Structures are given as C-alpha cells and as structure tokens.
Amino acid sequence: MHKGIVAAALLLSTSTFALAQQDRATDITAAQVQQVLKAPSKIVDHTLKVVDLGNYQLSVAVIKRGPTRAPGAAAPARAPDPKAVKCGLTAMPAGAKEASDGGIIHDSTDETYIVISGSGTLITGGQILNGTRSAPDSEVTKVLNGPSCSGKIVGNFVARKVTVGDISVIPAGVAHGWSDITTEVTYLSVRPDPKKVLEHGYVNPAIK
C-alpha cells in the first residue's frame, strides 16, 4: 500500500504548473521511506528527494510525529535566540481562539499531506502569533519548506481528525499544525517549489 501511495504522491500537483518535458521518472520505494524513518535523527520532518521538473521543483517528504502534549500542559521553555527575526501577529486578537500546540506558515510552498500511519488532529487556518522566521541557512528554509514563520496558531482555524488514507491540501500562506496525537501520525508531504528555493537535486542521506 505504501509503495502505491508514494508513487501517487509524486504525481500530485502536476496540473497546477506547466511542465517542461522530462525524459525520465523519479521513484521513491516503500523500502526507502522506511530507511529514512529508521535512520537516527533529531527532527521529525525528512525530505526524501527534490526533483527538478523544469518550471518548478517538487519535493517529497515523510514526517513521523509522536504524541502531542496533553491539553493544558505547559510547552517546554526555549532560550530566546537573539538573532531570530520575528513574524506574525504581535498581540492576541480580542476574542480569538488559541490552538493547544504551535504551527507554521510557508511563504511559497504548498503541501499535500497523505496519512500512511496513525492519526491525529490537523489544524489549518488562523494566524501565527509571536512567530519566528526560519533562518536563511536553516534546514527548514533550504531543504524542507522554504522560508517559513512558526509560532502559536490563533484565530479562525479549523481542526479535524485525520487517519490512514486521508489527504489534505494546504496552500502556501495557510497556518497549520497538529494536536491530539495519542501515539503517532506518519504522513507523506508533497511540496511544489515554484521559486526553486530548495536544494537542487537533494536526496536524503539515508537513501543515497
């Protein structure tokens, strides 16, 4: 099942952009996805490959998230980064609701999520409060999503339960995050890169 989902993921979003003629297909096998998931890593988001399709690049990633913190539990304290560039709202709008966990907005990268294991609550919409810009030389900017803003999600967001087989399309500029993950959720993310900001020809080290 996973092999078929990976193949389908590579074909998603192609109708959105005009393509230059390509002379070969790119494959990502189910075994390669598992290799990346099993490789030691301090992050949950792993780009598998970035493919140049002429007018744009297409990135395919796999993400495995563990349990989210319990409702009402305090988020772990982080030391402030004096070099960090702020983004998003600076004050909570009157009457706005607040998501229990943080989220992110990508400047120019759409995402299509395809859940392959587990379940959780996907939150989309709203705005980022007291956010931080991804650094120009960070993995988020160069390999994962391009320039982004992460922080607390507030405002008129939508929360829905997603499970194996569910697909969600998240446009660039739309805040998104997760909550209520009891054990884990694993999903593929297909990311068109119209500005070609991601590392050209990137292949995850675990499958080189």
Model-derived features: positions:
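Bacterial N-terminal signal peptides that target proteins for export
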Residues: M1-V6
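His/acidic/aromatic-lined binding-pocket segments of jelly-roll/cupin-type domains
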Residues: G102-I105, E111-I114, A159-R160, I167-S168
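Short, conserved beta-strand element in jelly-roll/cupin
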Residues: H106-G126, D137-S150
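Conserved metal-binding segment of the jelly-roll/cupin
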Residues: K161-I181
